[in-house]
């Protein structure tokens, strides 16, 4: 019988090289109360960072966002099936959020360190960092930030993501060499990552978009039809708000083009793991899909009709 909590070699072979080190600090005992407490702590800090990153002030919108992220199907599935790793996954979420917070403070090296830690804990949460960065750049453009400045920020963020990924890869290779362990190419394995020799990249890009849209409209939840309908309403409102803001709020054509590109890249960015893994993705890996609600809240914040604005969260929830 495979016991995940103590089979450290298996974790190393999956590339989750920092999980065994974290367990040494936390202890190998699977105590639900301890794991639950740590998970809530990490998750709460991540939410607070997100709220501060995007300067959210409206209490209703904050409650709306936090509630939807807290009941994310990934969170529910994690603690229903993999509670022994729940705090590890939430720490990966926190590291992804901290990387973006560090980037916002112009600490690129520190941001890269957190990207490295995130990948070494659970690679799937990398797309949370990607999604938050895309949303930050969209917010900057809506706030009237200069096109060149935002574009330069984008290049710096790519450098941070690549730097953290390279550092993770080098550390992983070193640890695997020392422990004489090879990367697995089985379930959740990394051995084939980056090998697209037998894959149609255009087709994979289309499938990456299709997968996330399917998960939004047909989520794997209780009352899937109701939740899918609510998500469809939020998506339609988000597109409507985006088009209105693109036309009325952004003055520079170059900024409009960049904002549109970021908006179109957003679904791909928060599902980048699907593309990298060539379709190997499941519910425990899709927390980032909930960033749709953050995008909705951000656009709602800029909506000029303030009298209608306060009723939109109720309409979306209904």
Features from the language model and the residues they span:
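Signature aromatic-anchored transmembrane alpha helix within multi-pass, membrane-resident enzymes
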Residues: 108-109, 231-236, 301-318
């Amino acid at each position: 019988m495979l016991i995940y909590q103590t089979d450290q070699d298996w974790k190393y072979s999956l590339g989750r090289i920092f999980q065994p080190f974290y367990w040494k600090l936390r202890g190998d005992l699977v105590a639900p109360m301890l794991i639950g407490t740590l998970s809530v702590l990490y998750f709460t800090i991540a939410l607070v960072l997100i709220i501060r990153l995007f300067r959210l002030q409206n209490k209703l919108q904050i409650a709306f966002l936090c509630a939807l992220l807290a009941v994310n199907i990934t969170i529910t599935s994690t603690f229903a099936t993999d509670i022994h790793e729940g705090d590890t996954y939430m720490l990966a979420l926190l590291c992804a959020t901290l990387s973006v917070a560090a980037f916002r403070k112009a600490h690129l090296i520190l941001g890269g360190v957190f990207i490295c830690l995130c990948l070494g804990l659970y690679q799937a949460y990398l797309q949370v960092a990607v999604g938050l960065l895309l949303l930050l750049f969209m917010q900057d453009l809506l706030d009237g930030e200069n096109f060149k400045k935002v574009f330069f920020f984008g290049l710096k963020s790519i450098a941070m993501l690549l730097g953290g990924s390279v550092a993770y890869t080098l550390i992983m290779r070193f640890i695997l060499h020392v422990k004489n362990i090879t990367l697995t190419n089985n379930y959740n394995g990394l051995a084939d990552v980056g090998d697209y020799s037998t894959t149609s990249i255009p087709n994979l890009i289309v499938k990456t978009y299709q997968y996330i849209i399917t998960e939004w409209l047909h989520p794997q939840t209780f009352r899937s039809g109701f939740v899918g309908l609510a998500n469809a309403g939020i998506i339609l409102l988000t597109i409507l708000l985006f088009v209105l803001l693109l036309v009325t709020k952004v003055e520079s054509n170059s900024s409009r083009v960049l904002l549109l590109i970021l908006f179109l890249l957003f679904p791909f960015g928060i599902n980048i793991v699907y593309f990298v893994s060539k379709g190997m993705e499941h519910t425990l890996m899709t927390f980032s899909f909930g960033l749709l609600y953050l995008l909705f809240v951000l656009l709602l914040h800029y909506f000029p009709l303030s009298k209608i604005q306060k009723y939109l969260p109720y309409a979306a929830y209904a």
